[in-house]
């Protein structure tokens, strides 16, 4: 297992950043240290970096005596380690994931590892475990927190602010910058996204001995909690993270980094979108080249061209190389297998349709029927000939060779740049088509969400339908029906007032105008409710936020807001506005991506 882990680290970070001599190396070998960090072509990113280190999750608080765990109908007093893991499961009893066999199996396996020998001998079947008292205890605690008096809520708020002031800021080159995630993630059960094969596994508590601290040589080294020491303290000014560790579920790196609203992060965002804008100038040439390569006599060149077509047209990720069984069976473009692709042979003038069905990033299922060019279809037929379902579709291609090809096409070009470019262009074009100047504010916001939805569909940003969706839709529908009745009543009152006016031969009275204004107001309210219901229904399975935060140039949205008189608060919440503060001055109403 150790060998597999080390090999995975080497592949994950193909280039080892320039080592800066660390002041303290307390644990870990050179091999384990080599993978820490994100690499960058630019060398020095800061001269001074000082911070307090991460804020660790509080120690486990044992259950009160009146809250018991039962096995086979009998109360069992668990050891502290086993009890803590039991509470993780008990808290989640109301969630659907605890009914899934994979979740239950993984949880029970990891839970038994935390038990004493006596507990393992006694507790052998999850079905005989009763966590109901534990679940009720935590539900009551949550309800008590919700109903706290205002004074106590204010006290908790002040304590959180004090913690923020202590751990939530750093000094970067003389400037006080906000840190994004200064707290380590508390221990619990891994849920993952989609049907992740590791759901239910135990996320272990992050300890100071797991953490690498990064700060400047002349700054004060953060103090670890009493009785502990850091894994390592280093001074690497070629990276922007403040602290890092490896989480135990997927052996992936976790970082404490600056808040997205900080100046350095804003500059990185700007650079990301500027690279995508540069692609706009060469994308036609790139497309012409890969279309020409569909006819190449070289198999590798044809596979490269079809893969690039998928990345461009379908916004697929490249797909990272990994050990067999190392993690979930998730794939990207380069790791597609024959079993992931079905070709629907055209007949009677029908289009060439390819069906793709695989687990993408975070085990989110990608299922799509897409019409492709005839040459792409024919190449796919050839790539799949004489292959078994588990064979690679692009067997002459690797992730590294594809990435190198992208760099040869344009400096800085990656699959993510293609996704960013196509997402931003799609948003801009959809907004142009869907927005009408004469529309109401509500309709304009709906148009924006529909444009955003087109991007989310392109990027396969899905979400599970919220459990409360049906209930909230029923509530909304009742409001609509009530509002319709009020509109109908107001219409009758207005007609009656109009008849009275005609009979008296009067000009419009104050009472008539008030009834007219009331009807208009009610009709506006009804329109807003109907639009909200439409928006809610259309986006019930689509995650709009991912693209908005990571792939859409904010200047497009800000320019659209300015052009059509839409308050930017309708598009971005406060946190998002802070994150994209850099874009507000750059985006006039005539900005074009």
Curated annotation (Swiss-Prot):
The active site is at residue 551. PROSITE patterns: TOPO_IB_2. Residues 1-43 form a transit peptide. Its EC number is 5.6.2.1. Its main location: mitochondrion. The keyword Cell membrane does not apply. InterPro entries: DNA_brk_join_enz, DNA_topo_DNA_db_N_dom1, DNA_topo_DNA_db_N_dom2, TopoI, TopoI_C_dom, TopoI_cat_a-hlx-sub_euk, TopoI_cat_a/b-sub_euk, TopoI_cat_euk. Keywords: DNA-binding, Isomerase, Mitochondrion, Topoisomerase, Transit peptide. One of its GO terms (biological process) is DNA replication. One of its GO terms (molecular function) is DNA topoisomerase type I (single strand cut, ATP-independent) activity. Divalent metal ions (calcium or magnesium). It comes from the Eukaryota. It is found in: Mitochondrion. Belongs to the type IB topoisomerase family. This is DNA topoisomerase I, mitochondrial. It comes from Rattus norvegicus. The gene is Top1mt.
């Amino acid at each position: 297992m150790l060998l597999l882990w080390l090999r995975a680290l080497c592949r994950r970070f193909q280039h080892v950043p320039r080592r800066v001599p660390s002041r303290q190396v307390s644990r870990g070998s050179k091999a384990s240290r080599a993978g820490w960090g994100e690499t960058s072509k630019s060398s020095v990113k800061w001269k001074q970096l000082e911070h307090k280190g991460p804020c660790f999750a509080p120690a486990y608080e044992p259950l009160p005596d009146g809250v018991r765990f039962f096995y086979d109908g009998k109360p069992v007093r668990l050891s502290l380690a086993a009890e803590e893991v039991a509470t993780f499961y008990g808290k989640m009893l109301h969630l659907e994931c605890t009914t899934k066999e994979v979740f239950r199996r993984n949880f029970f396996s990891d839970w038994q590892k935390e038990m004493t020998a006596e507990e393992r001998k006694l507790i052998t079947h999850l079905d005989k475990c009763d966590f109901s008292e534990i679940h009720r205890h935590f539900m009551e605690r949550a309800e008590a927190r919700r109903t706290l008096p205002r004074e106590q809520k204010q006290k908790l708020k002040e304590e959180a602010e004090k913690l923020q002031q202590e751990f939530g800021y750093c000094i970067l080159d003389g400037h006080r910058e906000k840190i994004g995630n200064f707290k380590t993630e508390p221990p619990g059960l891994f849920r993952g996204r989609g049907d992740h094969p590791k759901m239910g596994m135990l996320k272990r508590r992050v300890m100071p001995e797991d953490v690498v601290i990064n700060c400047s040589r002349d700054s004060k080294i953060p103090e670890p909690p009493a009785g502990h020491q850091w894994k390592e303290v280093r001074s690497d000014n070629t990276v922007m993270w403040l602290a890092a560790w490896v989480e135990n579920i997927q052996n992936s790196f976790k970082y404490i980094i600056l808040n997205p609203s900080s100046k350095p992060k804003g500059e990185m965002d700007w650079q990301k979108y500027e690279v995508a804008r540069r692609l706009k100038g060469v994308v036609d040439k790139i497309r012409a080249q890969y279309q020409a390569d569909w006819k190449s006599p070289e198999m590798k060149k044809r596979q490269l061209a079809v893969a690039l077509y998928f990345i461009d047209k379908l916004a697929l990720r490249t797909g990272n190389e990994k050990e067999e069984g190392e993690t979930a069976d998730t794939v990207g473009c380069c790791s597609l297998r024959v079993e992931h692709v079905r070709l629907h042979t055209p007949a009677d003038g029908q289009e060439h349709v390819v069906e793709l069905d695989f687990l993408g990033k975070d085990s989110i299922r990608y299922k799509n029927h897409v019409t492709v060019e005839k040459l792409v279809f024919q190449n796919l037929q050839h790539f799949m000939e004489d292959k078994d379902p588990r064979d690679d579709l692009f067997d002459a291609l690797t992730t590294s060779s594809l990435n190198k090809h992208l760099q040869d096409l344009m400096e800085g070009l990656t699959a993510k740049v293609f996704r960013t470019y196509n997402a931003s262009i799609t948003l801009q074009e959809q907004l142009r088509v869907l927005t009408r100047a004469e529309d109401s504010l509500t309709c304009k916001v709906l148009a924006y969400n529909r444009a955003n939805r087109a991007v989310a569909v392109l990027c396969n940003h899905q979400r599970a339908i919220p459990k409360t969706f049906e209930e909230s839709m029923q509530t909304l529908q009742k409001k609509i029906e009530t509002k319709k009745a009020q509109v109908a009543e107001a219409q009758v009152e207005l007609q009656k007032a109009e008849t009275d006016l005609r009979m008296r031969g009067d000009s419009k009275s104050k009472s008539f105008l008030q009834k007219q204004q009331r009807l208009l107001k009610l009709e506006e309210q009804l329109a807003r409710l109907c639009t909200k219901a439409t928006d809610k229904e259309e986006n019930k399975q689509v995650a709009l936020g991912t693209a908005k935060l990571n792939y859409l140039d904010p200047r497009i949205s800000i320019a659209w807001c300015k052009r059509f008189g839409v308050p930017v608060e309708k598009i971005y919440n406060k946190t998002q506005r802070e994150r994209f503060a850099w874009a507000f001055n750059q985006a006039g109403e005539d900005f074009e991506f």
